Amino acid sequence: MVKFAVVVFPGTNCDFETERAIRKAGAEAERVWYKTSLKDFDGVVLPGGFSYADYLRAGAIAARQEIIEEVKEFARDGKPVLGICNGFQVLTEAGLLPGALRPNKVPRFICRWVHLRVADTETPFTQFYEPGEVIRMPIAHAEGNYYADDPSKVRIAFQYSDEEGNITEEANPNGSLLNIAAIANENGNVLGTMPHPERASDRFLGSEDGLKLFRSMVEWARK
C-alpha cells in the first residue's frame, strides 16, 4: 500500500484531518515532524495551519527548512506533492509553484464555504473530477490572494465560481488573479490549493467533494 507523509511544522494545525482523509482515500498516512526523513514515503502533503505563526510571510520560514530539499526531490522524481492552504504558501515560497499568495483584498481572515469550478482534470490530483464540475470546499485564510507576473504560465486546477460554475468577481473571496483557487506545476505532480479538501471529505461535514482529490492522488501514486 502506498504511504503518504503529512509534514508537521511548528504551527501546523490541519494534520490530523489530512491524515484521516488520506486513509479514507485508501492509502497509509503518517504525520511526520519536519525534522524527520521522508525516504520511506511515496508522496508528501504539506497541510494547513500557521507554520511559524506566519512570521515574515505565510510559509516563508517553513520553506527554508531542510525537509523542503527532500520535498523538492519528490517533485523532481515525479512523485505527488500536495500543499493545502499554508502548504500552498510554502510551495510558492520554496519555488515549487509559480507566483505568490498575498494578503486578501479585504484585509481580514476569511473562513467560509466556496464553490469551485474544476479547470484541469489532467493532473494526478484532479483526474477523478469532470471538466467544468462545480464542487464545494471551505476556505480559511488571511493570505490567499494569488498573484503571478505571467498568468499564461500558470496551470490552473480550481477557480472560485458561483454555484453554476460562472467565474465572477462576486465569487472571488480574496481578490485572487483569475479567481485562482488551486494550481499545479507544469508536470502536474505538484498541486497547491487554498480551499481545504480534507474539510470536505465526509458527508457529515457538508461535502465529500474534497475526497475525490485524495482518491485521485492515491490512485495515481499506485501506478
Curated annotation (Swiss-Prot):
Keyword Plastid found: no
One GO cellular component, as annotated: cytoplasm
Subcellular location: Cytoplasm
SMART domains membership: GATase_5
Active site: 85, 196, 198
Pathway: Purine metabolism; IMP biosynthesis via de novo pathway; 5-amino-1-(5-phospho-D-ribosyl)imidazole from N(2)-formyl-N(1)-(5-phospho-D-ribosyl)glycinamide: step 1/2
Chain ranges of the Glutamine amidotransferase type-1 domain: 4-223
Entry's Gene Ontology BP terms: 'de novo' IMP biosynthetic process
Catalytic activity entry: N(2)-formyl-N(1)-(5-phospho-beta-D-ribosyl)glycinamide + L-glutamine + ATP + H2O = 2-formamido-N(1)-(5-O-phospho-beta-D-ribosyl)acetamidine + L-glutamate + ADP + phosphate + H(+); L-glutamine + H2O = L-glutamate + NH4(+)
EC number per UniProt: 6.3.5.3, 3.5.1.2
Main location class: cytoplasm
InterPro entries from the UniProt entry: Class_I_gatase-like, PRibForGlyAmidine_synth_PurQ
Cystine bridges: none
Keywords: ATP-binding, Cytoplasm, Glutamine amidotransferase, Hydrolase, Ligase, Nucleotide-binding, Purine biosynthesis
Molecular function in Gene Ontology: ATP binding; glutaminase activity; phosphoribosylformylglycinamidine synthase activity
Function comment: Part of the phosphoribosylformylglycinamidine synthase complex involved in the purines biosynthetic pathway. Catalyzes the ATP-dependent conversion of formylglycinamide ribonucleotide (FGAR) and glutamine to yield formylglycinamidine ribonucleotide (FGAM) and glutamate. The FGAM synthase complex is composed of three subunits. PurQ produces an ammonia molecule by converting glutamine to glutamate. PurL transfers the ammonia molecule to FGAR to form FGAM in an ATP-dependent manner.
Alphabetical list of NCBIfam families matching this protein: FGAM_synth_I, PRK03619.1
Subunit text: Part of the FGAM synthase complex composed of 1 PurL, 1 PurQ and 2 PurS subunits.
PANTHER family in alphabetical order: PHOSPHORIBOSYLFORMYLGLYCINAMIDINE SYNTHASE SUBUNIT PURQ
Listed name of the protein: Phosphoribosylformylglycinamidine synthase subunit PurQ
Lineage of producing organism: Archaea, Methanobacteriati, Methanobacteriota, Thermococci, Thermococcales
Gene that this polypeptide is encoded by: purQ
